[in-house]
Amino acid sequence: MIIYRKNFYFIFLFFIASLSYGDAHGDRSIKLEGVENDQTYSSPIKLNFIVENMKVRPAGVMEENSGHHHLLINLNELPDMTKPLPMTKNIRHFGKGQESTSLELKPGKYTIQLLFADHNHTPHKIPLITKKITFFIK
């Protein structure tokens, strides 16, 4: 009986702690529309960037709970999430606050992720990033 009670308290405390963690992140989310995993498309592809419970603002505009989108294309490893994202052919910045784009891609296999970062291109403490999507261009 004592073991059962200890397990119950442990589970209860874990549950309460997980709620606190969830509140710290809130119900913020990010979504990339226009491509799905393991599908084939013709170029150009039209992508829509959706973020919930955050404000989309241009780079340089410092405002709480805001930022802008970045596309990570064909990255094997994520960049350092504690520093501003570099601007490369594989890390595309949408610093004007764009919420969609059209990508002209050559035939082949691609991976893509959407990442929401602050006014300085630095990912938020709890990064808003989509899962990696693999797709093909014919």
Sequence positions of predicted segments:
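Short coil-to-beta strand junction motifs in C2/discoidin
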Residues: 61-69, 129
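Short, compositionally biased P/S/T/A/G/V-rich stretches that sit at domain boundaries
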Residues: 23-42
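Short acidic/polar inter-strand loop motif in beta-rich domains
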Residues: 78-80, 117-125
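Short, solvent-exposed, Trp/other aromatic-anchored flexible loops in extracytoplasmic proteins
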Residues: 85-119
